[in-house]
């Protein structure tokens, strides 16, 4: 089946924003104007089409990036039919992983900003991620009808805070409750949208006299920005002082795709003004799949780098960027097809796992309603039903042309809590539910703590884990109690000792006799456990030696200070004795355990606590508060770097003092800082911590 839309008329578009910038309403309007959605869903009524999970409707924040396909021919029908695949991305800091996933598969993005709040904390985070993936973008300043709306202030903030080369393509006509339209600086006309038809109709008019001087000033900046795209245009501009509309668009397009400028538009999505013109600019200025560099990957057989061009003739390759569980069809695997054609019913290779998978049905999504399709072409986004083993970030490709497209990197979880089902009957259901949720979301992990036996879930923040527990209840009908997080302490020793260990039971009948001498010594941190046998002359028969090793290792699981595992020690068995009849493996195991326990008590035992490597990115004005807070958490500041939007602080902080950090950092910096945390090493805990830990263990 031939493709319906040629690939140069595709736009894979991400809508990025901070919470409350009006992103979901903007997406709704796009669906309305492109003819997909006939009733406008408002977020504050909890009915938006893109927000398809119940918790999102309650909280009014977008959690899952839903992928939607729509078509656009221009506000005045001036274009050929273009296909726009929209990926809606969440704006909450705990969901940055979702944003990373969607940015990875986009060709271009539209950043939605609030005309009152301007560049907000999460905007900076999302901006950094878009820079990382070099995503060309335009900006849309929304909510121009709100009290305090100020378009040019937001443009200045983009320059100052995001270091963006922002180029306004429009100016607002009026603001707050008098906002009625925009001045198009390319056409030098006013655009007024018709309220009767919810903005489906519009008229061009002359620029209001009082705005003419300002419009001419900004038009000149715009033409200059376009002229800088090539020497040819610059020469023409210098000679004639202006450029044609076509030349301006061509120059702006080239520089937008090269990430040299950010064209800025404005409007009020809620009042049905501005989204239509923004869609026109998505078509005119943002890249199609063939305008961005061909994706590169590694051939797993040769380890050579290979390219995949965005054509239907190339071997099939696609990236799985999201897994979702649908109550009716099971697992949906969202894929971005980079090259070739994928047909329903064919077998493909998961090159990361080197496993073949059969593609069952393929669907395209409009929010959460589905249209079944027979094949997916290069440049398209769709969801496959029935893939068993694929997880987010893996590559699907032609069986005869294996390639691993760039692997997505997922941040380590930063917060962990223990969960237990409210009833015994829910135990198995909880395990299945958590496994499904972990498959959908690589930033969420589940493991069983061997020491406490608890199920520990970890994720990107408190809200992230709240929503996981919430989804277990709603989707899998499992109620869980959530405990306080546990820290995995360890113990070791600081001195060498020699210790006798004896186990004797000799009161009638067959007795038990085991007798050992152990030398117990500390090792370098991270060296682990070492057992040395120095028995000579058979004073301990060799068949009992493994039992001695086993007895020591079992006792090491239960340290003498607070019952935590003992690490980094060397144990040497150098002497002992045995009884011809009464000795046994069990007796020597128990003798060794006793000897180790007594010896460890004399060898200056210490408690070790996990230390985390913490990096905080913060605007400079909050740096003092952030450092003060890290110091109060027994943190050791190890250095600082400059970055575009502020400072990066490097510190080492005990894990026990990092709980609740996401929340307190958010309130310290009004949410403008973000942080990453990973395990660094174990360090000796100070006395006050040791006392607290021993006290809490003995309760």
UniProtKB/Swiss-Prot annotation:
InterPro entries to which the protein is assigned, alphabetical: EFG_II, EFG_III, EFG_III/V, EFG_IV, EFG_V, EFG_V-like, EFTu-like_2, G_TR_CS
Domain tr-type G: 8-290
Location(s), subcellular: Cytoplasm
Residues that, per the record, bind GTP: 17-24, 88-92, 142-145
Superkingdom, taxonomy of origin: Bacteria
Transmembrane portions of the chain: none
Pfam families: EFG_C, EFG_III, EFG_IV, GTP_EFTU, GTP_EFTU_D2
Function: Catalyzes the GTP-dependent ribosomal translocation step during translation elongation. During this step, the ribosome changes from the pre-translocational (PRE) to the post-translocational (POST) state as the newly formed A-site-bound peptidyl-tRNA and P-site-bound deacylated tRNA move to the P and E sites, respectively. Catalyzes the coordinated movement of the two tRNA molecules, the mRNA and conformational changes in the ribosome.
Protein name, UniProt field: Elongation factor G
Lineage of the species this protein comes from: Bacteria, Pseudomonadati, Pseudomonadota, Gammaproteobacteria, Cardiobacteriales
Gene: fusA
